[in-house]
Amino acid sequence: MLAMWRWVTKRSRLRRGHAHLGGNKGVRGICSLYLAGLSRGLSRVHAQRSHAATMADAGIPDEILYSDISDDEIIIDGDGDGDSSGDEDDDDGGLTRQAASRIATDLGFEVLQPLQSGSEGRVFVARRPGEADTVVLKVGQKPSTLMEGMLLKRLAHDNVMSLKQMLARGPVTCLVLPHFRCDLYSYLTMRDGPLDMRDAGRVIRSVLRGLAYLHGMRIMHRDVKAENIFLEDVDTVCLGDLGAARCNVAAPNFYGLAGTIETNAPEVLARDRYDTKVDVWGAGVVLFETLAYPKTIAGGDEPAINGEMHLIDLIRALGVHPEEFPPDTRLRSEFVRYAGTHRQPYTQYARVARLGLPETGAFLIYKMLTFDPVRRPSADEILNFGMWTV
């Protein structure tokens, strides 16, 4: 049966501002012997740069940096489902959907269904003629597609997306990926309600296991969100879309803007130094959304205007106390004035407390959304809390 991988009703298209900020640059730490120099060519149509920090310091507005150039493709039909159209959109440096589909056919696949294109290429559900099992094809000609494939070839974990094949047709790379039932955001949308703590715990534990594996290999995902978590059911969960990943991460540094505004950690939004703890923040946002759907962590239904405005909304919604801001950071110097003192520091966030979430869930959310990244526990530490019953 053709399973669904519905990218069309995601917040990244309709509600929240999706952005692979520097996502095409993120994997440039891998395979330097094979891909030396490719990172210089990694760019987005709206953000061509080799050093994210340079542009951030220059004050480049977020509407340029935080961009998803496939946003204009969406069409909502009468049934509320969506499909991407409009090959005039330049998602992949001029590779149209028709051209990508022809390449997939030339590589021996029968294309069954187009999916919403991402910044790294055109995406299809397909299968080999005569075979029942379906796969997902990501077809792209940007260096980032090749680099994501090279990264996936290094990975082997039940909770991280695997790579079935990596094929090439001239300058175009085709990644052959497993086809899951849906992503977590679509799962929540289809059930139109939150998960209970038992199921939410199973999902987030799998995500944390995948993150612990990546972080153990010094890989930072940088775009952990419900749309990038794929599942068959709550016991079969996979963290995917490593197009924004950064490798060889050791000490905190400013690795550029990447990911999605609404799930970015405060240190990224403030353009401070950061490390793998940003993925733990993203997982905390995911846990909140699974338990509080359709509510969002910062409140409101409109997409974030830009990163700084979202950060201000976040500080106010959570009721972050001035003492919780990390010292000697731009986060403190520029944003502490938006903090409040109506809540004691290092206690449950106001936003979470008002919703009456399960006690275990509220505790995990607070830990993963610890505002100071130095105090924020790692994925491994959270997995060892001893409170998991799922």
From Swiss-Prot:
GO BP, one example? Answer: regulation of gene expression
Q: Keyword Ligase on this protein?
A: no
Q: So what EC number does this one have? A: 2.7.11.1
* Single GO term (MF): cyclin binding
Catalytic residue list: D223
Catalysed transformations (reactions): L-seryl-[protein] + ATP = O-phospho-L-seryl-[protein] + ADP + H(+); L-threonyl-[protein] + ATP = O-phospho-L-threonyl-[protein] + ADP + H(+)
TM annotation in the entry: none
Domain of life from the UniProt record: Viruses
- Could you state what the record's PTM comment says about this protein? Phosphorylated by UL13 homolog; this phosphorylation regulates subsequent phosphorylation of UL31 and UL34 homologs by US3. Autophosphorylated.
**UniProt keyword Kinase, yes or no:** yes
Which sites bind ATP?
L115, Q116, S117, G118, S119, E120, G121, R122, V123, K138
Which GO cellular component terms, listed alphabetically, does the Swiss-Prot or TrEMBL entry include? Answer: cyclin-dependent protein kinase holoenzyme complex; host cell cytoplasm; host cell nucleus
Keywords on this record? ATP-binding, Host cytoplasm, Host nucleus, Host-virus interaction, Kinase, Modulation of host cell apoptosis by virus, Modulation of host chromatin by virus, Nucleotide-binding, Serine/threonine-protein kinase, Transferase
Q: What residue stretches are annotated with the Protein kinase domain?
A: 109-389
Q: Where in the cell is it found?
A: Host cytoplasm; Host nucleus
- Give, as one word, the top-level EC class: transferase
Family listed: Belongs to the protein kinase superfamily. Ser/Thr protein kinase family.
**Its job:** Multifunctional serine/threonine kinase that plays a role in several processes including egress of virus particles from the nucleus, modulation of the actin cytoskeleton and inhibition of apoptosis. Phosphorylates UL31 and UL34 homologs, two critical regulators of capsid budding from nucleus to endoplasmic reticulum, thereby facilitating virion egress. Modulates and redistributes host components of the nuclear envelope, including LMNA, emerin/EMD and the nuclear matrix protein MATR3. Phosphorylates envelope glycoprotein B (gB), probably to direct it to the cell surface.
Instruction: Report the protein name in the record.
Output: Serine/threonine-protein kinase US3 homolog
Q: Which gene encodes it?
A: PK
